[in-house]
């Protein structure tokens, strides 16, 4: 492809509304253009990347025995009412009526549609297991679409659904999809972690997320430095301390703390570390009354863990300021675990403390020198906090590190949730009707593109992994419009490279070399070949590798073989 015939409109300025680097570079590099909030047109350069991601996914899914289908994006409300999700889904589900006043939605996911298909097509256990996938546009009416294609309203997704006669068969396909996803992200060239995850609204009991590691990631993941253990922070278990609590040394004291409301303010005011403070949170209980949760001041409440406690309402709801005052006779900044007439659950780390500080349930006052068992009863305990760097790994091997991740894939063992709701059954070997066990497996295809940029860029632009780069090679003739020899050689090499199977972008624009070089760095083409009068005098072409900046001269004699040798050379990251 020649740039003079290509839609390539790069910019030097960073768009004001582009918050993260992938959004900035995709706009500046002419990969996407915004149509409306959360809606983007993929330009030719971006579409080449998107299609390469698609092709890798398709090849690996086909290799795993999955069958490709294409289901309607528009779905009738009747199917969603069968599972109850028409009522359960919020405003992110785009609903509308046709001319006959029948309700439909633009599908954000396809569990209902595929289950309806399978209950009509598959009758016997002999047809199982079966795994079907599609690569299709979805729509979720995000309240605040942001970050470009990272969190858009319309997005491209690979979603797969497997059906099984029993849980054993489901587990086998689930493990196969886990390995397939690992191969997909390896082939794309991403550094990622597969982590245990919460099943959320989709349901089921077992789930893993696949996260691309990047500083801009919205999710926190925990992984061991000595084993393969990895989990979303919301699921990573914080093990109880093994040391015995220290013996109390202080006496209970009531301290005036006017205007000191946060843990940071209290610890500074009392001149003690936040790890020796207790923070108390009031939440709605499952039986209607409030429940108090106590944590160390330097720890964060884990909502997923808390709402799984039988005493706590699910989803987690914090008490209102009015409820807090009515229960504790104090505002939120002055409440504590002492003297409460409601159930109290303390995190394992909080129970380990001695001589700690906490709110006194009196406005503007705190206790110091507080000890469990002496000044207040020993509480019920549970793991209700987020893990932190340095915590012991739950598998007993090594310690945990916390990193930011971008979720690009999610797999679930759904069990019989949808098949029972929609009466999807088959006959087993005895002729008895059984509900199908089901798995679902998603990859955010357009999100993978953005995540790859978040992980692979520098101050000059994108550094695409070679497997998904829009072109393999950028061919840059210097002043070809002034030099017949340079133009002739660039045209010849362009033809030879294409014939040899290379994907080549020939930049034949009449621009200054510095501008062209900057554009090629911006759009991230892995390898650059520069043809100049000086090089031709030496019968060479300059070769530069985008990833590590390595440059060398390649002889025009046996040019293709010399280039292939350079492409196979090891890369040292900067």
Curated annotation (Swiss-Prot):
Alphabetic keyword roster: Aminoacyl-tRNA synthetase, ATP-binding, Cytoplasm, Ligase, Nucleotide-binding, Protein biosynthesis
Record flagged with keyword Signal: no
Keyword Aminoacyl-tRNA synthetase: yes
CDD domains: ProRS-INS (cd04334), ProRS_anticodon_short (cd00861), ProRS_core_prok (cd00779)
Pfam families noted in UniProt: HGTP_anticodon, tRNA-synt_2b, tRNA_edit
EC number, UniProt record: 6.1.1.15
Protein name as annotated: Proline--tRNA ligase
Taxonomic source organism: Nitrosococcus oceani (strain ATCC 19707 / BCRC 17464 / JCM 30415 / NCIMB 11848 / C-107)
């Amino acid at each position: 492809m020649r740039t003079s015939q290509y839609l390539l409109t790069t910019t030097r300025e960073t768009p004001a509304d582009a918050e993260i680097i992938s959004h900035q570079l995709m706009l500046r590099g002419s990969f996407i253009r915004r149509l409306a909030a959360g809606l983007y047109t993929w330009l030719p350069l971006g579409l080449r990347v998107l299609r390469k991601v698609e092709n890798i996914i398709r090849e690996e899914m086909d290799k795993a025995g999955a069958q490709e289908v294409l289901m309607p994006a528009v779905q009738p409300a009747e199917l969603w009412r069968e599972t109850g999700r028409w009522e359960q889904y919020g405003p992110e589900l785009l609903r509308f009526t046709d001319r006959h006043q029948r309700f439909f939605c633009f599908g954000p996911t396809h569990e209902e549609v595929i289950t309806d298909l399978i209950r009509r097509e598959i009758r016997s256990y002999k047809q199982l297991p079966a795994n079907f996938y599609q690569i299709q546009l979805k729509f979720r009416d995000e309240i605040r679409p942001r970050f470009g294609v990272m969190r858009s309203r319309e997005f491209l997704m690979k979603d797969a659904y497997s059906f099984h006669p029993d849980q054993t068969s489901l587990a086998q396909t689930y493990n196969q999809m886990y390995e397939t996803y690992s191969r997909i992200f390896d082939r794309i060239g991403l550094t990622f972690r597969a982590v245990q995850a919460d099943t959320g609204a989709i349901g089921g009991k077992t789930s893993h997320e696949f996260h691309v590691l990047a500083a801009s990631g919205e999710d926190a993941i925990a992984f061991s430095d000595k084993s393969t253990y990895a989990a979303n922070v919301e699921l990573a278990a914080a093990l109880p301390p093994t040391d015995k609590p220290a013996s109390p040394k202080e006496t209970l004291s009531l301290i005036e703390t006017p205007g000191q409301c946060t843990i940071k303010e209290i610890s500074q005011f009392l001149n003690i570390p936040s790890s020796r403070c207790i923070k108390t949170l009031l939440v709605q209980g499952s039986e209607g009354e409030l429940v108090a949760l106590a944590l160390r001041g330097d720890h964060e409440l884990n909502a997923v863990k808390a709402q799984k406690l039988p005493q706590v309402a699910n989803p987690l709801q914090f008490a209102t300021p009015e409820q807090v005052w009515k229960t504790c006779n104090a505002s939120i900044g002055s409440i504590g675990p002492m003297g409460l007439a409601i159930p109290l659950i303390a995190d394992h780390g909080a129970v380990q403390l001695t001589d700690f500080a906490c709110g006194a349930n009196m406005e503007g006052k705190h206790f110091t020198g507080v000890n469990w068992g002496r000044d207040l009863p020993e509480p019920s305990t549970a793991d209700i906090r987020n893990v932190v760097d340095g915590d012991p790994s739950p598998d007993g091997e090594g310690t945990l590190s916390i990193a930011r991740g971008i979720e690009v894939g999610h797999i679930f063992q759904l069990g019989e949730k949808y098949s029972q709701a929609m009466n999807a059954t088959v006959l087993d070997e005895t002729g008895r009707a059984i509900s199908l066990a089901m798995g679902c497996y998603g990859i955010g295809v357009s999100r993978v593109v953005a995540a790859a940029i978040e992980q692979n860029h520098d101050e000059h632009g994108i550094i695409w992994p070679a497997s998904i780069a829009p072109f393999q090679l950028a061919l840059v003739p210097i002043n070809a419009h002034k030099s017949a020899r340079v133009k002739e050689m660039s045209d010849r090499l362009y033809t030879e490279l294409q014939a040899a199977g290379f994907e080549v972008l020939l930049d034949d624009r009449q621009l200054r070399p510095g501008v062209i070089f900057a554009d090629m760095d911006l759009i991230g083409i892995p390898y650059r070949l520069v043809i100049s009068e000086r090089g031709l005098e030496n019968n060479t072409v300059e070769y530069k590798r985008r990833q590590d900046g390595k440059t060398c001269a390649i002889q025009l004699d046996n040019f293709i073989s010399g280039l292939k040798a350079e492409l196979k050379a090891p890369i040292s990251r900067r």
